[in-house]
Amino acid sequence: MALVEDVFSLSPKAVSSALASLWRPIQGGVSAPLGFQAAGITAGLKDSGKPDLALLLAPEGAVCAGMFTTSLVRAACVDLCVDHLQACGGKARAVLINSGQANACTGERGWLDSLRASQALAGRLELPVEQVLICSTGVIGVPIPMDTLLAGLDPLVEALSDEGGAEAAGAILTTDLVEKQFALEAELGGRSVRIGGMAKGSGMIHPDMATMLGYLSCDVGVEVDAWQAMLKRVVDCSFNAMTVDGDTSTNDSCLAFAAGELLEQEHLQALEAGLLVAAQQLAKAIARDGEGATCLLEVQVEGVVGDVEARRIARTVCGSSLVKTAVHGRDPNWGRIVAAAGCAGVPFDPAAVALWLGPHQLMEFGEPLPFDRLAASRYMQERVDGSYLCDDTVQIRLVVGDGSGDGMAWGCDLSDQYVRINADYTT
């Protein structure tokens, strides 16, 4: 489903609110920008019979930027993406995504299978093989059933459409409960500009890329180096600022395509603002869809020396199992929050700490304040009962000094359902 709720909850220092407000949500996803096509089909890669093969095709002249897992154990498709982007100078045009098999820890066969898939698709699209990227998601150690995948390429290409974003978003899911897609539009330099996106992720989610796949598209031209730098800044404040369970994956990838008339230099900051809005919304959707989650957790940290340090504290709080279980139990246990913040490796004065849980202030000058525990617990329960990605967010605000740095991170609560899902994942 398209996520068109209020999304402009950006860090004040990430982008100005004036630039973010230029963008308005529209229906659609990754194929919403002009010239982009997408498709998603059921090829038979999953035993469940659910959609499992997706394709995104960018117009001629597109540039592509990529961010990938930081894990030393990387899937073959990640290595292939890196190699192909280098070989084509960032001029990739297509990405094929299979779900069901991660094709990680599969040795030389895994690499050859990814290469074979890219070669087969390149032939059908009449593209140089270096312009075709491959992404996989699913169970680690399981190779792709190549005969099944290759048999699915012809119907997949035939299904390409500028209205195929929703089908593509559905075909990349694994344990996700909902599709994650989003689109925006703005007037920049007297012309309409659109940004689209889709993502998947539910478990094995942690900062520095997580078991997530993210795809962004835009119908203006941007120089390759500027586009790559822009994507890195955006990912640092979105996909790298979320956590579900603290585990980093072998397959994490975020690819961004831009194609169209070159955008004037003076509008690049506004474009980045829109890209950040889209990426943050997708990141929040991933965190909210965390396995077994009942609510979204948003932590804002202020008062440290810089934004990077603020995000580090926020991520640490979001990732704390004790904080996450307290939120799930609707327990306003503020001690767990400040204890987690103190473990982030960022210096601050504990005597300067102030803390809020939603509208309830819990601490001031490093000491607890009297507060209505039942009301604070009720605040969290009301978020659980709220509507999806609208008023279902438990908000924590932590001020640790008078520095200029601020940052946000997103996570979710931790339930017994998460344990059941992952205990039974391969059985």
From Swiss-Prot:
Q: Which organism is it from?
A: Prochlorococcus marinus (strain MIT 9313)
Task: Show the Pfam families listed in the entry.
Answer: ArgJ (PF01960)
Q: What does this protein do?
A: Catalyzes two activities which are involved in the cyclic version of arginine biosynthesis: the synthesis of N-acetylglutamate from glutamate and acetyl-CoA as the acetyl donor, and of ornithine by transacetylation between N(2)-acetylornithine and glutamate.
Protein family membership:
Belongs to the ArgJ family.
| The protein's name | Arginine biosynthesis bifunctional protein ArgJ
| Annotated compartments | Cytoplasm
Assembly and partners are described as: Heterotetramer of two alpha and two beta chains.
Annotated site, Involved in the stabilization of negative charge on the oxyanion by the formation of the oxyanion hole, chain positions: 137-138
Q: Where does substrate bind?
A: 174, 200, 211, 291, 422, 427
Reaction it catalyzes: N(2)-acetyl-L-ornithine + L-glutamate = N-acetyl-L-glutamate + L-ornithine; L-glutamate + acetyl-CoA = N-acetyl-L-glutamate + CoA + H(+)
Enzyme Commission code(s) on record: 2.3.1.35, 2.3.1.1
MF terms from GO for this chain are: glutamate N-acetyltransferase activity; L-glutamate N-acetyltransferase activity
Q: Which InterPro entries match?
A: Arg_biosynth_ArgJ, ArgJ-like_dom_sf, ArgJ_beta_C
**4Fe-4S among keywords:** no
Keyword line:
Acyltransferase, Amino-acid biosynthesis, Arginine biosynthesis, Autocatalytic cleavage, Cytoplasm, Multifunctional enzyme, Transferase
Record's GO cellular component terms: cytoplasm
BP GO terms, sorted:
L-arginine biosynthetic process; ornithine biosynthetic process
